[in-house]
Regions:
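N-terminal export/assembly leader peptides and their processing motifs that target proteins to secretory
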Residues: 41-225
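N-terminal single-pass transmembrane signal-anchor helix
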Residues: 9-39
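N-terminal leader/signal peptides at the extreme start of proteins
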Residues: 1-10
Length: 225
């Protein structure tokens, strides 16, 4: 009888040990799950931080063609036109006034934040072909300010808004004052170098450097490369 009781007792102890072991296994599995999830979460956050840093280190815009200058009757470049498009991997960028900063660095002047927004195609016609017409219209838009430094954007193949998208192309047009207060010209003469910086809401600034050639003729379009 005593032997039978001892045998039953051993059986109960074995079951209890098994239950405790199972409990340990379940707890260990739960802890492992938590640790693995934390690892995945940390990895995801690290990836997002790296992607965000990469996005900020790259410009949202890139140059997309030839930079063109337009001289006035004094043989000086008064207008500069930069063709741009979205950089690879970018979905869109808003070009409206207040979201862009454009600065221009000249031999005798540094002009900060000249940007005035997007050219109104509703008023002046969609995707105008003749650049001179665009320049004339810009002069009309800023009537009374023809002698001021300014910059505007115009979007082609657009859907009527101020957002530049992947299927669209924009031109950033700068006007330089030939006779500003103080008498220091902002226009470019032969062999002057100009640097332009364009900064959107996200990403690094797009920087473009060009030099005016020698022997520029009056009222002519100049290929700046």
């Amino acid at each position: 009888m005593i032997k039978k009781l001892l045998k039953n007792r051993k059986g109960i102890v074995g079951i209890e040990a098994a239950i405790v072991l199972i409990a340990f296994v379940v707890i260990a599995a739960a802890l492992s799950y938590v640790v693995i999830n934390m690892g995945f979460f940390t990895t995801q956050k690290t990836k997002e931080a790296m992607q965000s840093g990469l996005d900020e280190s790259l410009s949202a815009l890139q140059l997309d063609g030839v930079v063109t200058g337009k001289t006035n009757d004094q043989n000086r470049i008064e207008w500069i036109v930069f063709p741009v498009k979205l950089s690879a991997g970018r979905a869109s960028i808003d070009l409206k006034n207040g979201t862009m900063v454009t600065s221009i660095y000249l031999p005798e002047a540094t002009l900060l934040n000249l940007y005035q927004g997007v050219y109104n195609e509703t008023m002046y016609g969609t995707d105008p072909i003749d650049l001179q017409k665009v320049l004339d219209n810009m002069t009309s838009i800023f009537q009374g300010k023809e002698n001021e430094d300014m910059a505007m954007g115009i979007i082609y193949n657009d859907d009527g808004d101020t957002v530049l998208e992947s299927t669209e192309k924009a031109f950033l047009i700068f006007h330089l004052d030939d006779n500003p207060p103080g008498g220091i010209r902002h226009t470019m003469v032969d062999y002057d170098e100009v640097k332009v910086e364009v900064k959107g809401a996200k990403g690094a600034a797009l920087t473009i450097v060009r030099m005016a050639p020698g022997g520029m003729l009056p009222n002519s379009y100049i290929d700046l490369g």
